[in-house]
């Protein structure tokens, strides 16, 4: 039996997204823009380059208020052109 994400979380809660994408200057701005639409606030994402510098990992933490918000952000962040993966 699979445990669903909403069964593991108690809202509101802190929720961190790790977004992996192509190392372009606009990647961080695009991630923050999407997050701001669904969870307005002040964000200071952490950015780590890959060993070869081709990709960046952007970590951003929100205060999630419901499971729909979490799932919508996964979908919209994953739809960004520069993004390769969202964890």
From Swiss-Prot:
It holds the Pfam family DUF493. It comes from the Bacteria. One of its GO terms (cellular component) is cytosol. Belongs to the UPF0250 family. HAMAP family: UPF0250. This is UPF0250 protein YPO2600/y1174/YP_1113. It comes from Yersinia pestis.
């Amino acid at each position: 039996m699979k445990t669903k994400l909403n069964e593991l979380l108690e809202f509101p809660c802190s929720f961190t997204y790790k977004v992996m994408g192509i190392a372009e200057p606009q990647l961080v701005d695009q991630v923050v823009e999407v997050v701001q639409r669904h969870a307005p606030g002040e964000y200071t994402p952490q950015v780590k380059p890959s060993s070869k510098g081709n990709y960046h990992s952007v970590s951003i933490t929100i205060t999630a208020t419901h499971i729909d918000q979490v799932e919508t952000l996964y979908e919209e962040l994953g739809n960004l052109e520069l993004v390769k993966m969202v964890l």
